[in-house]
Amino acid sequence: MAKFMNVVRTTVKVDCHDEFLEHHSELSKYDGQLSQFLIQTGDYSYCFVAIWESESDLIKARPVMIEFLNAIRHMMQEISPELGVTDPVSGPVIFEQ
């Protein structure tokens, strides 16, 4: 079974930056999640990246991940009316070295 990854891009409101980082530092791994990363891509821009054992593990974790997102949603800037505050993508790992 192929590993699966998800990536979520977001921008944090300036006055919520420290609170956003604190919430992520307290985040535990979800069942089926092999690892997770928060990368800073700009002054207030971030991508959350996670590697999963399988797509089904990611799907099972979605309700809990949405709860986490709802708890921090007020800290993030809207990317666009179509996307809201996050730009998520996911897919199977095609190559790993």
Role assignments for model-derived ranges:
Residues 1-70, 74-97:
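Short S/T/G/P-rich N-terminal loop/turn motif that feeds into the first structured element of a domain
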